[in-house]
Amino acid sequence: MGEIIFKRTKGLTEKETHYCPGCTHGIAHRLVAEVLEEMNELDSSVCVSSVGCSVLSYEYFNIDAVEAAHGRAPAVATGIKRSISDKNTLVFTYQGDGDLASIGLGETMSAAVRGENITIIFMNNAIYGMTGGQMAPTTLEGQKTTTSPYGRDPKTAGLPIKMCEVLAQIPSAI
């Protein structure tokens, strides 16, 4: 009898993902689900996702999930964490860079400044992926997108936001 090399985590549903070929969201989902299972958190975690490629993550994670308005996942996660009776519940957001670093920048920064007891999983592909690959706030200098076919020019588009480095400067962000 052969050795079992891979076993599907209980943290994922059986549904096939809708992601584009080569996209890392499916791998990230598997890794998050495996960690939740390893930590025995599948029954005590809540995922909050919002508009963008992450919008359908509730279809794939086999845990409680909530969908937030565009960019508002940290605010919704904060509300859940503060109001839930079991304070050990792991509440996390799963967001892309367009959602987190653009329309949700204020919510992201505010949650960090307040030191909210939530986890934010940041999927940075440096473009707006769901709508066709347009330049995002995190698009790298010189990176070509559908709206910057010659590459991001800092003279006209500014420099990319380096969200992890920005958040690392906030003492209350854990």
Locations of regions flagged by a protein language model:
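Short aromatic-enriched loop/helix-cap "lid" or pocket-rim segments at secondary-structure transitions
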Residues: 132-134
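Generic secondary-structure signature for well-ordered alpha-helical cores
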Residues: 25-28, 37-41, 82-86, 113-116, ...
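Thiamine diphosphate
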Residues: 53-129
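Glycine- and other small-residue-rich loops at beta-strand/loop junctions that grip anionic moieties
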Residues: 21, 97, 152-156
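Conserved active-site and cofactor/substrate-binding residues in soluble primary-metabolism enzymes
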Residues: 23-31, 42, 71-75, 106, ...
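Short catalytic-loop micro-motif centered on adjacent basic/acidic residues
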Residues: 19-21, 93-95, 174
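Active-site diphosphate/adenylate-binding microenvironment
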Residues: 4-69
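Conserved thiamine diphosphate
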Residues: 10, 136-174
